[in-house]
Amino acid sequence: MRHNKAGRRLGRTTSHRIAMFRNMVTSFLEHERITTTDAKAKELRSIAEKMITLGKRGDLHAQRQAASYIRDKKVVTKLFSTIAPRYKERDGGYTRIIKLGIRPGDNAPLSVIELVEEQVNKKEKKAKPAKAAIVATAPAVEQAAVLTSPADEPVVAEENAPQSAVKDAVDECEGKAD
């Protein structure tokens, strides 16, 4: 039984799965974005984030650990020189998974996994005009409550009329409708 066993097997032997993820991490760090299935992307995320954390450490031992997993020396250099410094202020969460839909051939759910880019440029907020200026420029509109009876006879209630007069007018209209 497979109780308490973490990770996805993805229908592959252990050696095949390890080789596949080594290739995927190398491609991901080289291109900074790849398209794959949802399950592979979710599993790749943890491995890639561990590699970026090694890159942030930056010592010789971390470089050797990364080189033992990543297949291309140029990608290891890129990890330590360009990718890791980009995330020096960020504690985890270096990747993003965006779902794309399904693959037409086998109906597999596809995703794009990419490195998160920092948003440096923020839009400046425009100053809003004061509300008092807006109210002063608006034309004055007379307030009159118009009540319609079922017989389509409009009953206009005056602005300063007492509530009892309004109720009488409504009752009068309802009496005519019956």
Curated annotation (Swiss-Prot):
Gene3D superfamilies (UniProt xref): Ribosomal protein L17 (3.90.1030.10)
GO molecular function term, any single one: structural constituent of ribosome
Compositionally skewed regions (Basic and acidic residues) per UniProt: 168-178
Keywords: Ribonucleoprotein, Ribosomal protein
One CC-aspect GO term: cytosolic large ribosomal subunit
Superkingdom of source: Bacteria
Coiled-coil regions listed in the entry: none
Pfam (any one): Ribosomal_L17
Region: Disordered, residue numbers: 150-178
One example of a Gene Ontology biological process annotation: translation
Assembly and oligomerization: Part of the 50S ribosomal subunit. Contacts protein L32.
PANTHER family per record: LARGE RIBOSOMAL SUBUNIT PROTEIN BL17M, RIBOSOMAL PROTEIN L17
NCBIfam families: L17
Family that this chain belongs to: Belongs to the bacterial ribosomal protein bL17 family.
Protein's recorded name: Large ribosomal subunit protein bL17
Organism: Geobacter metallireducens (strain ATCC 53774 / DSM 7210 / GS-15)
Lineage per the UniProt record: Bacteria, Pseudomonadati, Thermodesulfobacteriota, Desulfuromonadia, Geobacterales
Recorded name of the encoding gene: rplQ
